[in-house]
């Protein structure tokens, strides 16, 4: 790899390694592809070590990071839940992370520490704070998986939600205008996202 600074004075030469993919990047195309994708499998991603909620039973996995109070996240979850074709073709793993403030942190923990199926918890999130508060709480709730989820979101650069990782590693930072088209790899339209409020 050869990198020349704008003014042409400095030249960097050497190897570039992608730790996530565990491989050397040798071409511009490989570098471009690596910077636009998140390869969860080579990062050692295992759904069972993170706080996640599953919808669907298809062979292709899609991972999404959402916030309890994110309107675009709610719209995306509703679209997925109501589409039998999506649920047949994909398995969706929703990771709830507190991107939008302290209240989101409280409700992300409340969802994780509640009793119910994944679908029931996601439905409560869609219905709002009252429904989430009504979920029965576990008697004991280790937070390791939720903490790992927040750490993973920071490692891969989740700054706004929803953050969608397609089965082939492509990323949508925001709600895809057409989730089916995005998952098929078609050219995306403008995505919609909720970002953390500026302090």
Cite the ranges covered by each PLM segment.
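Structural alpha/beta surface segment adjacent to cysteine/selenocysteine redox centers
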Residues: 59-142, 154-159, 184, 193-197
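N-terminal targeting signals for export/organelle localization
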Residues: 1-41, 196-199
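C-terminal cap of thioredoxin/glutaredoxin-like
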Residues: 1-13, 128-199
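Short coil/turn linker and secondary-structure boundary residues
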Residues: 23-26, 116-117, 144, 174-177
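A broad, low-specificity signal for short, low-complexity segments enriched in glycine/proline
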Residues: 22-27, 52-56, 122-127
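Glycine-rich loops and low-complexity Gly/Arg-rich segments
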Residues: 19-20, 27-30, 37-39, 87-91, ...
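A short beta-strand-turn-helix
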Residues: 40-61, 82
């Amino acid at each position: 790899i050869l990198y020349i600074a704008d003014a042409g004075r400095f030249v960097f030469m050497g190897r570039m390694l992608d730790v996530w993919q565990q491989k050397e990047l040798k071409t511009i195309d490989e570098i471009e592809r690596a910077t636009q994708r998140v390869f969860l499998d080579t990062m050692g991603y295992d759904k069972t070590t993170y706080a996640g909620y599953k919808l669907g039973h298809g062979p292709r996995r899609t991972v999404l990071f959402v916030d309890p109070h994110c309107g675009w996240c709610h719209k995306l979850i509703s679209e997925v839940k109501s589409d039998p074709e999506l649920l047949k073709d994909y398995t969706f793993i929703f990771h709830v992370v507190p991107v939008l403030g302290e209240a989101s942190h409280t409700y992300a923990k409340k969802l994780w520490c509640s009793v119910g199926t994944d679908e029931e918890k996601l439905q409560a999130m869609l219905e709002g704070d009252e429904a989430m508060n009504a979920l029965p709480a576990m008697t004991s709730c280790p937070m390791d998986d939720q903490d790992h989820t927040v750490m993973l979101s920071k490692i891969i650069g989740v700054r706004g939600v929803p953050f969608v990782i397609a089965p082939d590693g492509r990323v949508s930072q925001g709600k895809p205008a057409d989730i089916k088209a995005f998952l098929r790899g078609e050219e995306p339209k403008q995505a919609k996202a909720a970002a953390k409020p500026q302090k």
